From Swiss-Prot:
GO CC terms of this entry: cytosol
Domain of life: Bacteria
Complex and partners: Homodimer. Heterotetramer of two MnmE and two MnmG subunits.
Keyword Cytoplasm applies: yes
Cofactor(s) of this protein: FAD
Protein name per UniProt: tRNA uridine 5-carboxymethylaminomethyl modification enzyme MnmG
Gene: mnmG
Subcellular location: Cytoplasm
TM spans (from-to): none
């Protein structure tokens, strides 16, 4: 038995320095709270144990939202990327997504340096074994060395280290990601405190030596020449021009035969793996079995950094035995002679059932305790970072005795993510998708600053200088809209020729420039050229104005739906309501309401298994004052 001793006191303690923990700790420190960030290993701060990239559909928007609120992830990737690409450029603005290939080692070093040089923030290596909980309130943590740290709020971000178990074929051993030390006792402590845990599984592919790849047999995927950024503070002139390409290749029938011949040794199919894996990131053996009609699957070869030869074999996640992995790799075009530097593996880990959380990410049964990241059942660095930021903000507010901060489904993808977790729970690693957002034309990649910067400034995470620049951008958008309404586009041969070139009907009479801009494929730059009028030099201002005008009708429809949502969100459900007193509720609805304890009628409406009749009964029960009579 290790003897405990009283160590330092803090306002906020964050356990785990992955992508969630880093955002949580930085937010707390920036809000003026004395913060301790504890990690199992200092070499794993903001480490990328799987894909060395940031962003993509929905996820890229989350990174922009983190930046707009004053978080770090966007700045960190802008300082350390080796390639940047905008995805879905041929589609509408609601689904466009920025994705960056990271130098994973630089990413870790840059984040660690940021943390080490942030006032109010202490970084320490230790394993947290136990929470200090008194009368249902979390008041600190105890480490494996016996140090007892006291705090007003605690944030847990254990990632995949919680009772982590790595599986490679027949080999199984206790481990955190990338062969790090796992966290065992903390999970046991959470169970003793009454938390419901479950097992999830994720996996990672082999890494191969880039010097042994025959790139002539693969297809190049270069970065964009047009400057792109995740952070609104990054400058176009700093955009990296000499980017490192990724490469694309495919599996083939030989690969699939190797996999099928060894399914009797595949932990995914032998029953060895008990945890539920991610639906949207299946292992290659799972894909071959589930999609037996496909004769090939796409693979991306992604460099892990500028100073390493390790290449990540994307979309090739596997837990097959090592010698089988070698055969699989060598069957792929371009990888016939590739040297495998690290085998792929599966990892099982504990997660907290997220219905046990409030929208602030505070736990319902232990006050002043917050959880964030993969331990809440999500997958992905970006989802983790978004949760970490919200948990860190609320831990800091809680430490100051202030009310919590939440984002709605109409505010941000982060709001969609947290609401899905809290009201619906998840039976598998949750991945954020654009299809999960009802208001995705409002929640775009390009307008995260317009949606969220004001919140960040009020919280103390956005500086006055940055907020002033934001206000100037908003004014420039208004000025540009007004300018377009003043300018007339006249019928000229040049205008008619231009319209013909983009497949548009010719003009019959002159129109205001904002009306002309509604036409597909017309830009403000085109209007400037055709009219000789200078409108605005900032491409980001032009982008906002163009989208606002072209999609005005659709945006108005979404705003109408959001107004209805807000009316429902305003209808609060008393916290101590007894659902057993409500006559007529379906049994499933009664059980779900009792378990999840929704705070508003809008949240109750989103719980799976609840039908409109149940909502009507609940609404009438509250509105008619029956609740108040019962509780007198």
């Amino acid at each position: 038995m290790i003897k405990t001793y009283d160590s330092n006191e803090y306002d906020v303690i964050v356990v785990g320095a992955g992508h969630a923990g880093c955002e949580a700790a930085l937010a707390s420190a920036h809000m003026g709270q004395k913060t301790l960030l504890v990690t199992i290993g200092l070499d794993m701060v903001a480490f990328m144990p799987c894909n060395p990239s940031v962003g993509g559909p929905a996820k890229g928007t989350v990174v922009r939202e983190i930046d707009a609120l004053g978080g770090q992830m966007g700045k960190n990737i802008d300082a350390t990327y080796i390639q940047m690409r905008m995805l879905n450029t041929g589609k509408g603005p609601a689904v466009r997504a920025l994705r960056a290939q990271a130098d994973k080692w630089q990413y870790h070093e840059y984040m660690k340096d940021t943390i080490e040089n942030t006032p109010n923030l202490t970084l320490r290596q230790a394993i947290v074994d136990e929470l200090v909980v008194e009368d249902g309130v979390c008041k600190g943590v105890i480490t494996n060395t016996g140090a007892k740290y006291h705090a007003k709020s605690v944030v847990l971000t254990t990632g995949t280290a919680a009772r982590g178990k790595i599986i490679i074929g027949e080999l199984m051993y206790s481990s955190g990601p990338n062969n790090t030390t796992p966290s065992i006792k903390l999970s046991e402590n959470l169970e003793k405190l009454g938390f419901k845990l479950r097992r999830f599984k994720t996996g990672t592919p082999p890494r191969v030596n880039g010097n042994t790849i025959d790139y002539s047999k693969t297809e190049e995927e270069p970065g964009d020449k047009v400057p792109r950024h995740f952070s609104y503070e990054s400058k176009d002139e700093n955009y990296l021009q000499n980017q490192i390409s990724c490469w694309m290749t495919y599996t083939n029938p030989v690969t699939h035969e190797v996999i099928r011949d060894n399914l009797d040794r595949a932990p995914m199919f032998t029953g060895v793996i008990k945890g539920v894996g991610p639906r949207y990131c299946p292992s290659i053996e799972d894909k071959v079995v589930r999609f037996a009609d496909k004769d090939r699957h796409q693979i991306f070869l992604e460099p892990e950094g500028k100073t390493t030869k390790e290449v990540y074999v994307g979309d090739f996640s596997t837990s097959m035995p090592e010698e089988v992995q070698l055969k699989m790799v060598h069957s792929v075009a371009g990888l016939e002679h590739a040297e495998m530097m690290r085998p792929g593996y599966a990892i099982e880990y504990d997660v907290v059932e997220p219905w046990q959380l409030k929208h602030t990410l505070e736990t319902k049964n232990v006050k002043h305790l917050f959880t964030a990241g993969q331990m809440n059942g999500t997958s992905g660095y970006e989802e983790a970072a978004g949760q970490g930021l919200i948990a860190g903000i609320n831990a800091a507010l809680s430490a100051q005795g202030k009310s919590g901060f939440t984002l709605g489904r109409n505010d941000a993808y982060i709001g969609v993510l947290i609401d899905d977790l809290v009201t619906k729970g998840t039976n598998e690693p949750y991945r954020l998708l654009t299809s999960r957002a009802e208001y995705r034309l409002i929640l775009r990649h390009d307008n995260a600053d317009l949606r969220l910067t004001e919140y960040g400034h009020k919280l103390g995470l956005i500086s006055d200088d940055r907020y002033q620049a934001f206000e100037e951008k908003k004014q420039a958008i208004k000025d540009t809209q007004a300018r377009l309404h003043e300018i007339t586009v006249h019928v000229t041969d040049e205008v008619q020729d231009f319209l013909k070139s983009i497949g548009q009907e010719p003009m019959k009479a002159g129109v205001k420039a904002d009306v002309f801009l509604r036409r597909p494929h017309v830009t403000i730059n085109d209007i400037e050229r055709l009219t000789g009028q200078k409108i605005d030099g900032d491409r980001y201002v032009k982008e906002q104005v163009e989208i606002g005008i072209k999609y005005a009708g659709y945006i108005k429809k979404e705003e109408t739906r959001i107004a209805r949502l807000k009316r429902q969100e305003a209808k609060k459900i008393p916290a101590d309501i007894d659902y057993n007193m409500i006559e007529g509720l379906a049994t499933e609805a009664r059980q779900k309401f009792e378990k999840i304890r929704p705070e508003t009628l809008a949240q109750a409406e989103r719980i799976s298994g609840v039908n409109p009749a149940d909502l009507a009964i609940l609404s009438v029960y509250i509105q008619n004052g029956r609740y108040s009579r019962v509780n007198k």
